[in-house]
Design a protein with these regions (language model features):
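N-terminal structural module
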Residues: 1-73, 140
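Glycine-rich, pocket-lining loop/helix-strand segments that form or immediately flank
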Residues: 56-103
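Beta-strand-rich interaction surfaces with strong enrichment in secreted/lumenal proteins
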Residues: 106-109
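Hydrophobic core residues within well-ordered beta-strands of beta-rich domains
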Residues: 116-118, 132
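Short, conserved beta-turn/loop elements at beta-strand boundaries and strand-helix junctions
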Residues: 126-130, 143-145
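Conserved small/polar residues in nucleotide/adenosyl-binding loops
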Residues: 148-155
Length: 156
């Protein structure tokens, strides 16, 4: 096999399709939201979702100490939210970076403008080098807007 540069690996792996979502996290009075793209469902029974989180991030620190986190997905028309959460978030009562949130019974933030959200209980943490893969079991989820509304915004 030939030597592959880090640049070639980065350019190539960026072509793997990935959804964008916001991970909501909380521990001991500190809240955060973080844009994430390494997201996948890993099991139907139990219902598990996995997310890759940078080991140097605030979100990693919070998720590593807490048993719960959220995954929030947004309309393709509402992309500004992802820019707002590329750096640590500022929390004020009912808001993260001025985005309205509601806290679950486990005190993790769900984003009021999300088209679907999942509350997850961490079942496994797998350190894979620069990132840790958190696997969580779905303990609650909701699609606040109608499926018809979502379909109307899809492009073929």
């Amino acid at each position: 096999m030939t030597d592959i540069s880090n640049e070639e690996i980065n350019v190539s792996t960026w072509k793997i399709p990935s959804p964008l979502g916001i991970i909501g996290s909380h521990f001991d009075g500190q809240f955060n939201g973080m844009t994430a793209s390494w997201i996948t469902q890993v099991s139907m029974e139990p219902a598990l979702i996995g997310v890759g989180i940078d080991n140097k991030s605030v979100t990693f620190d919070l998720m590593d100490k807490s048993n719960f986190y959220t995954l929030n997905m947004f309309s393709p028309d509402y992309t500004k939210v992802f820019v707002k959460f590329s750096k640590p978030a500022e929390y004020s009562e009912g808001f993260l970076n001025k985005e309205p949130i509601t806290l679950t019974n486990n005190s993790v933030p769900i984003f009021d403008n999300a088209t679907v959200w999942f509350e997850l209980k961490t079942t496994q943490k797998i350190n894979l080098g620069t990132h840790t893969f958190f696997i969580g079991e779905i303990v609650n989820c909701k699609t606040p807007v109608s499926y018809t509304h979502l379909r109307a915004h899809e492009t073929l």
